Amino acid sequence: VELLIVVAIIGILASIAVPNFMTSVHRAKQKSTMKDIVSISTVITDYVTDNESTPAQDGTYNGSTDFYKALSPFYIKVLPITDKWGNDFRVWTGESANHYGISNPTLNDFLVASFGRDNKQDSFFFRPNDPEGGSFLLTRMSDFNKDLIMWNGSWIRRPGIRSRRGC
């Protein structure tokens, strides 16, 4: 009987601890992925400053692509290729930066995105009149599946606290 009570207590503690641990692991991966997106955006901005346009890119890249070679090692020693879930980053530059509702992109425009934990692109649509519309609260594990997106160095899709309208 005592052994059953001990096993039951361990089971209860495990059922509480494991989800909290998994949330912490994914939160750390998300924050680290966001830092990598900032790094990628910063080096693209530096490249634009020197060259007056972005290096051409339309989607995923690797160490042998022209995009990667244009940025590494001159602007950054090692350009991140995958997010912390092991999924490829997506970068769209110039005219190909027309995803997520961005219209009429110029040669200097760029998007950097992680498709999140599930590696599936969201149907997110950026609305310039509602810059906070891209923030979301982390309330469930599925929220780690949401895309993380920077446009020209500014977050348009990220976890955060949405302010209350009219307050």
What does each model-found stretch correspond to?
Residues 20-38:
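Aliphatic-rich helix starts adjacent to a transmembrane/signal segment
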Residues 42-45, 49-100:
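Extracellular/periplasmic head regions of type IV pilus-like filament subunits
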Residues 9, 84, 114:
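Short glycine/serine/threonine-biased micro-segments
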Residues 96-167:
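Short, surface-exposed interaction loops/tails
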Residues 1-22:
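N-terminal single-pass transmembrane signal-anchor helix
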Residues 33, 85-87, 106-108:
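Residues that flank catalytic or metal-binding motifs in active/ligand-binding sites
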Residues 33-34, 50-53, 57, 123-125:
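Short, solvent-exposed loop/turn and secondary-structure capping segments
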